Every structure is written in structure tokens, then in C-alpha cells.
Regions:
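Hydrolase active-site cap/lid region
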Residues: 185, 189-238
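N-terminal targeting or regulatory segments adjacent to alpha/beta-hydrolase or S9 domains
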Residues: 1-54
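Short beta-strand element of the alpha/beta-hydrolase
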Residues: 71, 75, 81-91
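Aromatic pocket-lining residues of Rossmann-like dinucleotide-binding sites
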Residues: 104, 165, 191-192
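Cap/lid segment of the alpha/beta-hydrolase catalytic domain
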Residues: 96, 102-105, 109-156
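Serine-hydrolase catalytic core
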Residues: 242-256
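Gly/Ser-rich "nucleophile elbow"/oxyanion-hole loop immediately N-terminal to the catalytic nucleophile
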Residues: 137-182
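A short loop-to-beta-strand scaffold at the N-terminal edge of the catalytic core in hydrolase folds
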Residues: 55-60, 64-76
Length: 256
């Protein structure tokens, strides 16, 4: 099927094919309200290298299920408060290198960059889910409860980090920005929706959006391949199709 299957005017008014669950807002309110001060504990390790303008740190904290999550933190050396960028990486990757991230300090910003659990960086994914782990994280945990879904955990990892950075001595809490590309854009949007202290959000080509539309257009390939794989192996007659997309709707960023 063509990727351009509706007129431009219709696209301009299009709001997505995903049906937002009736309890979507209540579900995510419960999730973030379950975060306690214990969840916001972290360990900050200063790196040996530095320069006159910047200080470099590694951040470790526990995700919602106890998995150890890793992030890089760079801030200007001056002893005052600065705007801070919360940067998220694209799918299968990891946080950018120290040199790359140092560019934020050059314009007077701090930056924190998280490694998504179980992908290309240092964050831990402790697993323990029911169902397939093949062909991508979109379907990871789909056969279990909502709390088992991989991206529910990643979204909460990102939210916890957004709360942690508010505690940093050099954070100007009135100037917190979330940013990302692809998967990172999805996380940037989700944390901006869940944490009202984030006052700016910048996205590039977001992933994890409008799963039903992706399926209807036969674009369930590459990062979305898990959807096709799941139906071929576990529901070839599509008996559970409605249920599957209803569950995916809880992590579909079109609903945030």
C-alpha cells in the first residue's frame, strides 16, 4: 500500500487511528503517582576528565522495576543554575558521547542523556516478562499485564530521571527541555506530558506513534517489525487483533 494514501488536506486534519483507552489518563496518573522519594534516589560519579568550562558525571538510579539505569550528565563549571536539556537517543542506540554532548555547555546549558534499558548503552534490563522478545521491543511484554510492557518501563525510567534532574544543584527548574529523535522523540514527548516542570519539548521524526496506522499501511517493518512477527506467530487468524492494539494504545504517543 502507498505510504501517501490520503490527500494532504486530510493529513493536515488527521489525529491518528489509535483509539485512546478510556482509562488512559488515569492509568498514567496512577503510574507517576506511584513514584516515591525512594525511586528518586541516585548516585552521581564525577569523571576524572574535565575542562575549564565543563564538569562531567555519570548518573545511576533504579528504574521502576529495580533495573539499574545509566545516564551522562554535563554541566557548566560556574556555580549557578542553568537551563538543562534532557536528551534521549534513537532506537537500538545509546546516549551520545561526552564530546558530542559537550556542545550544550558551549551555549550555556547543562545536559542529561539516558541510556534506554537493554539497548546499546549501559542501562540494565532485568527481563522477567511473559511472551516473545524477538523482533523488537514494541511487543516486549505484550502477552503479560500492562505493567510488563517494555515501553511502560522505559517511559517511567525517563520520567524518574526528569524528576531526579530537578534536584541537581545547578538545574534552573524553570528551564527544563526534553529533546530526542525517533525513539528519543517519543520519550521526550512522554516526559513532557507527564512532568509539568518540563516547559519546552523538541521532537524529530518520532517513533512509537499510531501503531494501528502503521499496520493498516503495511509499514510494520524495521523498528515496527515486531507487530507483523507477533501476528504471524501468535495470532495468525487475528482473533486478538483488537485486544493487541488496545494494549499498544497505552504506549502510543499519539494518546499523550
Amino acid at each position: 500500500m502507498s505510504m501517501m494514501d490520503m490527500p494532504i488536506k486530510e493529513m493536515e486534519a488527521y489525529l491518528g487511528s489509535s483509539i485512546k483507552p478510556n482509562d488512559f489518563d488515569n492509568f498514567w496518573d496512577r503510574e507517576i503517582n506511584s513514584i516515591t522519594e525512594e525511586n528518586l534516589k541516585y548516585r552521581m560519579v564525577k569523571k576524572e576528565f574535565k575542562n575549564k568550562q565543563s564538569e562531567y558525571y555519570e548518573i545511576y538510579f533504579n528504574g521502576i522495576d529495580g533495573a539499574e539505569i545509566y545516564a551522562k550528565y554535563i554541566c557548566p563549571s560556574s556555580k549557578k543554575k542553568f537551563p538543562i536539556v534532557l536528551e534521549f537517543h534513537d532506537y537500538k542506540e545509546a546516549s551520545k558521547g561526552w564530546y558530542h554532548l559537550s556542545r550544550y555547555v558551549a551555549i550555556g546549558y547543562s545536559v542529561v542523556a539516558m541510556d534506554c534499558r537493554g539497548q546499546g548503552g549501559k542501562s540494565q534490563d532485568i527481563g522477567g516478562i511473559k511472551g516473545s522478545t524477538v523482533c523488537g521491543h514494541v511487543i516486549n511484554g505484550l502477552d503479560g499485564e500492562l505493567k510488563d510492557m517494555y515501553y511502560r518501563k522505559v517511559y517511567l525510567d525517563a520520567y524518574i530521571l526528569s524528576r531526579i534532574i530537578e534536584k541537581f544543584e545547578k538545574t534552573d527548574i524553570s528551564k527544563i527541555i526534553s529533546f530526542g529523535k525517533g525513539q528519543g522523540a517519543a520519550l521526550a514527548l512522554v516526559v513532557a506530558a507527564l512532568n509539568k516542570n518540563i516547559n519546552k519539548c523538541s521532537l524529530q521524526y518520532p517513533f512509537l506513534v499510531d501503531f494501528k496506522r502503521v499496520w493498516d499501511m503495511d509499514l510494520d517493518v524495521n523498528a515496527y517489525e515486531g507487530i507483523r512477527y507477533y501476528f504471524r506467530w501468535f495470532d495468525p487468524m487475528h482473533i486478538r487483533e483488537k485486544e493487541v492494539f488496545e494494549k499498544l494504545a497505552y504506549i502510543d504517543i499519539v494518546n499523550f
